[in-house]
């Protein structure tokens, strides 16, 4: 399954992330948080069963023109069940982690448009189609 979401912030906050040193690399820490979140989804969500994981990938795309970061998480499991809940959990944990590290620079940070892009595994599954037509990606 593949999910993504955005975090919008001030130009100062985004520059802090771009210029962050390796010891305090905001996106690396957010990536670790998201991967840890994959393993904890069944503990965080009532009635959600643990999924044995095969693959977790966390990517970030920085758009300096609009001071926004897109987080994309792809999760595959060893079971036949999909990993949609894990992917959505991970995206939000990555965004919250970024928020937590730059909130002292910008108190108007907005996390938005967290959604599922692909359901199922990488070889088969349903692509998200924005049926409602009211979301601007």
Residue ranges and their predicted role:
Residues 1-49, 55-137:
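C-terminal binding/interaction regions
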């Amino acid at each position: 399954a593949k999910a993504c979401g955005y975090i919008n912030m001030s130009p100062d906050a985004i520059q802090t992330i771009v210029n962050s040193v390796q010891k305090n690399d905001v996106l690396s820490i957010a990536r670790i948080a998201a991967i840890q979140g994959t393993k904890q989804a069944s503990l965080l969500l009532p009635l959600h069963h643990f999924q044995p994981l095969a693959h977790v990938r966390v990517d970030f795309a920085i758009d300096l023109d609009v001071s926004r970061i897109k987080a994309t998480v792809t999760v595959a499991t060893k079971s036949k069940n999909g990993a949609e809940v894990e992917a959505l959990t991970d995206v939000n944990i990555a965004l919250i982690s970024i928020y937590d590290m730059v909130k002292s620079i910008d108190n108007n940070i907005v996390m938005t448009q967290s959604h599922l892009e692909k359901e199922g595994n990488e070889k088969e599954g349903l692509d998200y189609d924005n049926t409602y037509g009211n979301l601007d990606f």
